[in-house]
Amino acid sequence: MVISLEYKWIAMSNVLISSLMGTINMSIVLIALPAIFNGIHINPLNSFQYLLWILMGYGLVTATLLLSFGRLSDMYGRVKMFRLGFLIFTFASILLYLTPSTGDAGALEIIIFRVVQAVGSALLMANSAAIITDAFPSTERGKALGINTVAIMSGMFLGLILGGILAVFNWRYVFLVSVPFGLIGTIWSYYKLKELSVKAVKTGLDIWGNLTFLVGITLLLVGVTYGLIPYGSSPMGWSNPWVIASMIIGLISLIMFPIVESRVESPMFRLDLFKNRSFAYANIAGLLSALGRGGMMFMLILLLQGIWLPLHGYSYSSTPFWAGIYMLPLTAGIIIMGPISGILSDKYGPRWIATGGMIIVTIAFLVLASLPYNFTFIEFALALFLMGIGGGMFGSPNSASIMNSVPPEDRGVASGMMYTIMNTSFTASMAIFFTIVIVGLTQRFPVAMTASLANIGAAQLSPILSNISPTAALFSAFLGFNPVSSILSALPAPLAAMIPHSTFNTLTGTTWFPSTLANAFIPSLQTSFYIGAILSAIAAVLSALRGGKYVHGDEILKTDSNNGLKPQEVETEE
């Protein structure tokens, strides 16, 4: 089928709308959480489980559905599923805006509606790369996927800014902002998108594969999530029998998953595609990259909101907005390099461009790990910009490498597999990084609190303030407020009157708690950055092993001694 120049950009515009809508929605919630919790009258210090589910539930549901939706799209049409994704996402955004309840009921409604929204997001994500790949020739796919990367990162930044602005007026507006995107995308895709894909043979749904993957991923991530929440007298939940059972059953299910997929007639996770060298190494490199970088943004926002911004005179209420502003160098690096790396990979192949990107990311992690908590912004911005440049160099060439390596009828399932690996790794990375930080805080925070109180002559408050759990301290930083103020305001009047006025002002000011938290937080944060550097370095090695430039379907005529001329797929060296 001949694809017009006009249609390529029509398809691209549809995908860009979905990318902007999805990523704006993800980051806008991240920044607006304090306003959301205040709006539904939830005390975040006592509601960690709601915070974690609002943050991680979206990624969990998306990750578990991508594979099935990718396979269904190959069988029934990518455009049809893409349109349905727009419709569901828009409907869920309206429900979130209209959330009627407050308190625990309101939090549960938001979580449920976010799950519905994630279903729409999974339908969009499973098909976006495949629709671009169908519409663009192999010589332009890297550029096209690079442009989509720019839209994704622009959406992340716009979400941070919009969340900071809209939450000031009404927390519901942070969900309403997705509705115009959804309506435009639904109408535009219905009237303009065409079904260009070669449909795969319709087969039965892989029920056992879906079941083992869904159970495995869900229980494993649920176990990790509740492992972060205090249980009984323990500051973390790893001794909770339900957490232990979830982790064990989840791991067993995931071990069973490839065994099941190797035996069913129509697997949703096509293990045979991993026989292709380019597909296999690109996906594994992507997995390690996502594991290394997935939790990094949350850790950096914790660092900015809980420590650096208050130390530099920003009020706690303003830190969510300014944290988004100070993350701009990361976004700028990706926006600059995304299209450039895509164009270069179209011409020279993805191997060395993507590998160079992971090497730069490794260096950026090491720079971040070397910074003191009271760093200068120039140092921080340089590290973030390097991280963005490296991420931009890796992202679009790696995606193009994966999508170019499969036949047209398998692009939906390949896209679903790619984004499943990416989303699962991002969600797991966030849980892993949180765990590393909380374990470190558990060991160091009570000691740091006692020492800081003694330094200001308030050792008598140690029994009270040392009871702040590490989890409470961490999420207080994440939500941008000082938990010491809440605790002191709840003290009985006679006890509060015994605290000297100058000491009270020091405790509730913008510098004492961040400095105390920093002494316990920074060593664990540095450990997370070193782990990110190691994972990125391994990803660079695997990226280099992917082989030369390869595009499935590009053929040359070779002379066969028995059959004369016949077409063959080849791998060209860079």
Enumerate the predicted regions with their spans.
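Hydrophobic alpha-helical segments of secondary membrane carriers
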Residues: 18, 147-151, 205, 285, ...
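Transmembrane core module of solute transporters
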Residues: 12-59, 241, 253, 263-399, ...
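Hydrophobic alpha-helix/TM-entry signal in multi-pass membrane transporters
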Residues: 8-15, 82, 110, 205, ...
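Transmembrane-helix exit segments and adjacent C-terminal regions of multi-pass membrane proteins
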Residues: 1-15, 23, 278, 346-349, ...
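Interfacial helix-cap and linker-helix signal at transmembrane-aqueous boundaries
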Residues: 36-37, 72-73, 162-170, 224, ...
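Hydrophobic transmembrane-helix bundles of small-molecule transporters
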Residues: 169-284, 292
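Transmembrane-helix bundle of Major Facilitator Superfamily
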Residues: 2-191, 341, 368-369, 380
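C-terminal module of multi-pass small-molecule transporters
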Residues: 65, 77-88, 93-96, 100-112, ...
